[in-house]
Amino acid sequence: MRHTLFISDLHLEEETPSITAHFLYFLKHQAPKADAIYILGDFFEAWIGDDNQTPFNRKIIESLQTLARTKPTYFMRGNRDFLIGQRFAAMTGVSLLEDPSVIQLYNKPVLLMHGDSLCTLDHKHQAYRRKIMKPWVQKLMLSLPLSLRRKLAKKFREQSRRHNRTLSYEIKDVTPEEVNRVMKEQNVELLIHGHTHRPAIHDLTINGNPTKRIVLGAWHHGGSVLHYAQDGSFELQAFKIDL
């Protein structure tokens, strides 16, 4: 049956070759069978600018380029790869999506988000997010030498890890009230997002109507894919390959 695939939170980097291997397997064996592929943020562990053309980044860009030649591929930036820009899109052939975006998925309106904006109890992250999403801040960051950007990215990741260790389970998750608000605002019955690394299908009720929230999984222990079929059925699928 015709279907569309959704992934997020691969956190690709040269230091985790197993995740890269799982992604390349996905590209070879799963993606070619789909109508389209959606990547919903934190595809990279860190992205410091489209001009950072390391051998590893070139390898990933070329793999996306091969995919996008034959399959519509959509890319939403996350909090780790928010500096991805139009040059990356041109090099890979992906179509960039704003966060949030409503798409028509087999004639059904579906809200797509990365997901970090839903975690409203994490006040420190929300303040950081408001800052880094300002165009002038991004322009300033991209004007810095690559060597300095690498150091800053490493510093930000270390700060993020320390911050996350101090947070409770509830604070790191989405806020139900914010989920309800955005789904009402966008007038949708299905929300798909990543970020929290807690793959699940949540049944909700909004304005008396049954709705669903699908959370995509991270790739730290293998691949994680949402398979959404033309008939409206869907499944979160995990896979592992022998390395």
Curated annotation (Swiss-Prot):
It is a peripheral membrane protein. Keywords: Cell inner membrane, Cell membrane, Hydrolase, Lipid A biosynthesis, Lipid biosynthesis, Lipid metabolism, Manganese, Membrane, Metal-binding. InterPro entries: Calcineurin-like_PHP_ApaH, LpxH-like, Metallo-depent_PP-like, UDP-diacylglucosamine_Hdrlase. Substrate binds at residues 79-80, 122, 160, 164, 195. It catalyses: UDP-2-N,3-O-bis[(3R)-3-hydroxytetradecanoyl]-alpha-D-glucosamine + H2O = 2-N,3-O-bis[(3R)-3-hydroxytetradecanoyl]-alpha-D-glucosaminyl 1-phosphate + UMP + 2 H(+). Binds 2 Mn(2+) ions per subunit in a binuclear metal center. Its cofactor is Mn(2+). The keyword Cell inner membrane applies. GO terms for molecular function: manganese ion binding; UDP-2,3-diacylglucosamine hydrolase activity. SUPFAM superfamilies: Metallo-dependent phosphatases (SSF56300). Coiled coil: none annotated. Pathway: Glycolipid biosynthesis; lipid IV(A) biosynthesis; lipid IV(A) from (3R)-3-hydroxytetradecanoyl-[acyl-carrier-protein] and UDP-N-acetyl-alpha-D-glucosamine: step 4/6. It is found in: Cell inner membrane. It comes from the Bacteria. GO terms for biological process: lipid A biosynthetic process. Mn(2+) 2 binds at residues 42, 79, 114, 195. Its EC number is 3.6.1.54. Hydrolyzes the pyrophosphate bond of UDP-2,3-diacylglucosamine to yield 2,3-diacylglucosamine 1-phosphate (lipid X) and UMP by catalyzing the attack of water at the alpha-P atom. Involved in the biosynthesis of lipid A, a phosphorylated glycolipid that anchors the lipopolysaccharide to the outer membrane of the cell. This is UDP-2,3-diacylglucosamine hydrolase. It comes from Coxiella burnetii (strain CbuG_Q212) (Coxiella burnetii (strain Q212)). The gene is lpxH.
